[in-house]
């Protein structure tokens, strides 16, 4: 997991994160950086990783979009 800032937007890169850890990592990231929304979550090409991130965000009523396949943008809490 890598957190970086690009063009003023904070990114979470989930490459290398185990599927069982995705939900906790995503929710921790969103709440830790909520003042910086919008946020980007890079899931990569794994459909399962994308599903896990969407599930975690939906469970916590977090509004998001997917501007490109494998990239999720957190819009608001």
Where are the predicted features?
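Long, charged, low-complexity intrinsically disordered regions
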Residues: 1-77
């Amino acid at each position: 997991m890598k957190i970086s800032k690009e063009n003023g937007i904070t990114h979470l890169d989930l490459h290398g994160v185990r599927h069982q850890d995705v939900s906790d990592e995503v929710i921790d990231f969103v709440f830790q950086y909520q003042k910086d929304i919008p946020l980007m979550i890079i899931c990569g090409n794994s459909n399962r990783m994308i599903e896990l991130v969407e599930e975690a965000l939906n469970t916590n009523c977090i509004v998001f979009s997917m501007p490109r396949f494998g990239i999720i943008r957190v819009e608001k809490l």
